[in-house]
Amino acid sequence: MTSLHKNQVKFNSNITISHTGGQLSSDSGLVLVKELMNIFGFSELAKQHIHIEDERAYFTHDNLSILEQFIMQLIAGYSADSAANLLRQDPVFKAVLDRKELASQSSLSRFLDRLSEENIHELQALNQELIDKARLIRNDTELIIDLDSTHSDTFGHQEQTNYNTHYQTYGYHPLVAFDGLTGDFLKAELRSGNQYTSKGVKSFSHLY
């Protein structure tokens, strides 16, 4: 059977990547995501930028490990924090996050509750530094800011949700910005559903 060349990742010497057509994990692509995060020094950058007020006297999972787990879940397509309970014993997730057991859904929910508005700005700054590193690697010299609004449906009684006449449904109406040349995600700002498309665009366009 033909096999592709094996590659060993740098963040964990016990993991190698190959494809022989045998059994595969549906989330094995996260190994490559983790390798990229390791090359960019994500964990160290997160420690520098993110400072979450935490009054827990005892905990198993620190805030940055929960953040990385949540990011991995979102990248893998698990948008609901409740998926954490199904993934706690997933071998790929445990390997890339270097944890014997992952944080539960309740731990993720409490983590999200701890995030402040200042933490949101810190996450934006972290995102921008990662983009800057990518731009240096690609030797990018031009930037086109593709700025637009979008709609996010809400269900139940969510804070600041409102009716949007254009989409004819309840939800949020956030602003988002991408690099029109590379597709890099530059920035996002959550707004209530009834906000006009261009409201706040001037201040939003000041990137980090």
Role assignments for model-derived ranges:
Residues 1-170, 174-208:
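Dynamic "connector" segments at or just before major functional cores
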